[in-house]
Regions:
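Secretory targeting and sorting signals
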Residues: 1-29
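Residue position within the beta-strands of beta-propeller blades
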Residues: 37, 99, 142, 206, ...
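Short loop/turn segments immediately following the C-termini of beta-strands
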Residues: 40-42, 52, 102, 145-148, ...
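Short loop/turn segments immediately following beta-strands, especially the blade-tip
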Residues: 49-58, 109-116, 167-176, 217-225, ...
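A short beta-strand motif characteristic of beta-propeller blades
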Residues: 61-78, 118-124, 177-186, 226-234, ...
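Beta-rich, blade/repeat-based domains predominating
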Residues: 67-90, 125-139, 148, 184-203, ...
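Asp-box/WD-like beta-propeller blade repeats and closely related beta-sheet repeat scaffolds
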Residues: 116-198
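Blade-level signature of beta-propeller repeat domains, shared across WD40, Kelch, NHL, RCC1
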Residues: 364-402
């Protein structure tokens, strides 16, 4: 029987072999940026790096083990994706990358080194079932669902443990240190899906699908959460999932609605709130995108446009956004496979990358995934300009881009 170390080595070799199939190696010196995805594999999680050229095309880079395990499923449904927004995140200066290991209840920090990564540390997230993280100016927070941990991946059903969040300080070199007093309980069975820190580190926000609300926690001088204010989900919507914060405190949520078997689907919405005045937690605006299970949001650098991917519709919606939080849906583009999940955009906001998963609906088998490449037009519309081979694992969860 192979040792754990041998199994991990074999797994990494297999991922590298499949990830490079059908892709040109590309000139290393031509990289203008990168796309990072997490395999979320139960046998050993890893981050796959793609190099981006000036035309937005992606070329396979390396595969870097996290030192932890992914999950064969997630706490909500017996499918091999994280069911969250934020499994992989970059520091604002893009010099550090953080990847969550659901199956090990840990998070790993990497230094970004040219076209590769250097692993720095892997630490406990202080809870069970970590699924989302965000990093800002030396502070990182991570949510824990309280769901099945090691030994019970993909067991299905709602989490039975205590949902929490926990904060860390990270050094310029990537070392993670827990923030004393930061571990905070979230409502039971709240199913946290995303967490975001505001750039000034005065507050953070967490979407809680199971509780049908988003909570805004003020942070004290030591970056410890204080008493939160709850933003109930917009009337006519349900289950806030993805989360984005703008530079002028507009908070956006992607409300997944009631997808099958809970409801008929087609009722997802994008909703905005004023996060600067939590004493009046009512929506600024809400616009239906007529999709099912809208669960991920990415904004352009100037915050004038945004994109929301819908898992069960297999679509990416474009929308415009004003400084006052007014939302207007522009249109939608299909992904090349069945399910649309995590997204990332290039730092110049010229290209959008979307994880597109090939699913066998009869067997509920997530067979493989690829990255679809879209050009972001000046009017916020998208144009599909390429795709990688269907070479990534079907469990791939989390994406960050530079």
């Amino acid at each position: 029987m192979l040792s754990r170390k041998a199994r991990r080595a074999a797994f990494t070799t297999a991922v590298l072999a499949t990830a490079t199939a059908g892709l040109s190696a590309g000139p290393a010196h031509a990289a203008r940026g990168h796309v990072y995805v997490s395999t979320n594999a139960e046998a050993g999680n890893a981050v796959v790096v793609f190099n981006r050229d000036a035309k937005g095309r992606l070329y396979q880079g390396g595969v870097f083990e996290t030192g932890g395990n992914g999950a064969g499923g997630n706490p909500t449904f017996p499918v091999p994706i994280s069911d969250s927004d934020g499994m992989v995140t970059l520091s604002p200066n893009r010099k550090l990358l953080f990847a969550i290991n659901i199956g090990s209840n840990t998070i790993t920090s990497f230094q970004v080194r040219g076209n590769g990564l250097r692993r720095i540390s892997t630490v406990s997230t202080g809870g069970i079932g970590p699924n989302a993280a965000d990093a800002r100016n030396g502070v990182l927070y991570v949510t824990n669902t309280g769901g099945p941990g090691p030994g019970a991946p993909g067991s299905g059903g709602p989490p039975t443990g205590q949902p929490t969040m926990m904060g860390f300080r990270y050094s310029s070199g990537g070392t993670l240190t827990p923030i004393s007093g930061s571990q905070t309980n979230l409502p039971p069975v709240s199913l946290p899906a995303a967490i975001r820190l505001d750039p000034q580190l005065t507050y953070l926000a967490v979407t809680e699908r199971g509780a049908n609300q988003t909570q805004r926690f003020p942070l004290d001088a030591g970056h410890v959460p204080d008493t939160p204010v709850a933003y109930p989900v917009n009337a006519g919507s349900a289950h806030p999932f993805a989360l984005a914060l703008t530079s002028n405190d507009v908070m956006l949520t992607a409300d997944e609605g009631n997808p099958p078997p809970e409801g008929p689907g087609g009722d997802s919405r994008i909703t905005s709130y004023n996060a600067a005045t939590p004493q009046t937690p009512t929506p600024l605006d809400s616009d239906a995108n007529s999709q099912t299970a809208t669960c991920w949001i990415v904004l352009t650098g100037n915050e004038r446009y945004g994109f929301a991917s819908s898992a069960l519709s297999g679509m990416v919606t474009s929308f415009s956004l004003t400084a006052q939080g007014q939302i207007t849906v522009i249109g939608a583009q299909p992904v090349t496979d069945t399910v649309a999940t995590d997204m990332g955009r290039s730092r110049d906001s010229k290209f959008l990358y979307v994880n597109s998963i090939n699913v066998d609906p009869m067997a509920l088998a997530f067979k493989s995934s690829r990255i679809d490449i879209y050009r972001i037009n000046s009017d916020g519309t998208l144009a599909l300009i390429g795709k990688t081979a269907s070479s990534l694992l079907g469990s791939t969860s989390g994406m960050a881009a530079s």
